Regions:
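A conserved mid-protein helix/loop that constitutes part of the nucleotide-sugar donor-binding site
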Residues: 58, 240-254
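Conserved donor-binding/catalytic core segment of Leloir-type glycosyltransferases
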Residues: 222-243, 263-264
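Nucleotide-activated donor-binding/catalytic signature segment of Leloir-type glycosyltransferases, i.e.
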Residues: 267, 271, 275-304
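Short alpha-helical segment that forms part of, or immediately flanks, the ligand-binding pocket
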Residues: 303, 326-330, 344-345, 351
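Aromatic "clamp/platform" in nucleotide-sugar-dependent glycosyltransferases that forms part
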Residues: 317
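Short hydrophobic beta-strand element within catalytic cores of glycosyltransferases
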Residues: 334-337, 347, 355
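Conserved acidic donor-binding segment of nucleotide-sugar-dependent glycosyltransferases
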Residues: 349-360, 368-373
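A short, well-ordered alpha-helix in the C-terminal region of glycosyltransferases
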Residues: 368, 375-390, 396-402
């Protein structure tokens, strides 16, 4: 019996850098293979807070497979936590993106206690490099004082305007690492340790991004009761206030007053995000007959929506890096994104997408695209090429090979 289409597509190319040759060229593939060979045996351990939902998971899932396929032993461990712990770490996330709320002594105690319990479960004696992702497991480094291997902390959050008090607290942990890695240079902080900058990337061979025919994508939308006889506008993201779903709904309503269209909000909630369900309920109370809210965990639906949408929105008010922006651009979509964080590095306004700061600007761009069918084709072609050049997983893989070459423990 053959694999289901979802399984078959989800495994295409995950293990082989050679799959990328038609996209990045033979010389780039050879360079990556040479870097991996020169590293020799190495063991890298990633530590994060969830296997499900969110950008870190989207990145580490294919990256760990590709590194193992290259002969770099790469493991991925999760920390466990109580609902109270994840409520605290969500608050940390929000404050790092500029929320002015305070982090109480009780919350600090919960945060540090749960991380200390997780340290007891981790056995890292045989690895060459430890990579810790985002604030949730950050204090782990303090529980391995006799460590001999380098520790790297990678922050995937928009740190352009962090809450000063909370950042000062977390900085005491960050400065115990050998290096802090941020998505963009504008997130750099005043730190006593080295800082590096590594932008995220997408896997073009995953079920979410692999090629899909017009008939396949239309059929997928129909299965989910999405009308295909009028233009579709979509935003695909976590249900999170930083993604501004209420602003998306308002921009859509203003655009719909001029051009008939449908809005599809598709999202899921990561297991380390306790606020998501509250936001989802808020959205559901705000919708009307022209707005569809879906929570399906279906990468093929994401693929189909990004291919068929007349406009893809990512109207974030904070965004470390918009993976959904890159995914949609890879499919030749016109993306209207918030003029914040990493989105400003992904979209060159008016060239390969549009940047907006207000609801009214978003509505005007939606109408502009709907009234100019050729614009999507012209702008979409430039969008896809910019992703091919800068934001494919092969580039991220090479960045990690360079990090390992610089920091690994030579036994």
């Amino acid at each position: 019996m053959g694999l289901s289409p979802a399984v078959e597509k989800s495994t295409l190319g995950l293990h082989s850098i050679q799959q990328y040759e038609p996209l990045i060229g033979r010389a780039a593939v050879a360079r990556i293979l040479d870097k991996a060979a020169r590293l020799g045996p190495a063991h890298l351990v990633h530590i994060s807070s969830t296997f499900y939902g969110g950008g870190v998971t989207e990145i580490l899932t294919p990256l760990t497979l590709m590194m193992n396929a290259l002969g770099i032993a790469t493991s991925w461990h999760l920390i466990q936590g109580t609902p109270a712990f994840f409520a605290c770490t969500k608050k940390l996330h929000n404050t790092l993106q500029g929320d002015p709320m305070a982090f109480s002594d009780e919350e600090i105690a919960i945060y540090e206690q749960v991380v200390s319990e997780n340290a007891l479960r981790l056995h890292l004696e045989d690895c060459d490099v430890v990579a810790v992702h985002d604030p949730q497991p950050l204090p782990l480094v303090g529980h391995f004082t006799d460590r001999s291997m380098p520790w790297l902390w990678q922050c995937h959050i928009d740190l352009s305007t962090p809450n000063a008090a909370v950042w000062n607290y977390l900085r005491s942990f960050v400065e115990r690492y050998n290096v802090a890695i941020f998505s963009l240079p504008e997130y750099a902080q005043a730190l006593a340790v080295e800082q590096r900058f590594v932008a995220p990337a997408i896997d073009p061979f995953s079920a979410k991004n692999t090629e899909m025919s017009e008939d396949e994508s239309l059929a997928c939308l129909v299965r989910h009761c999405i009308r295909v006889d009028r233009p579709v506008i979509t935003q695909i993201s976590r249900f999170d206030r930083w993604k501004d779903p209420m602003g998306v709904i308002e921009a859509f309503r203003r655009a719909r007053a001029e051009v008939d269209c449908t809005l599809v909000l598709l999202g899921n909630n990561a297991t380390d995000d306790p606020e998501g369900q509250v936001m989802l309920e808020t959205i559901r109370h705000a919708v009307d007959d022209g707005i569809i809210v879906l929570t399906a965990d279906d990468p093929l639906l994401v693929n189909a929506l990004q291919r068929q949408a007349a406009v893809v929105l990512q109207k974030s008010t904070r965004e470390g890096f918009g993976l959904t922006v890159t995914e949609a651009m890879w499919k030749g979509a016109v993306v209207v994104g918030g003029e914040v964080g990493g989105i400003r590095r992904q979209i060159q306004d008016g060239e390969n997408g549009f940047l907006v700061s207000t609801v009214d600007q978003a509505a005007r761009r939606i109408v502009q695209v709907l009234k100019d069918p050729g614009l999507r084709q012209r702008m979409g072609a430039r969008a896809r090429e910019s992703v091919r050049e800068r934001f494919l997983l092969s580039r991220l893989l090479e960045d990690w090979l360079d990090l390992l070459a610089a920091y690994r423990l030579h036994r």
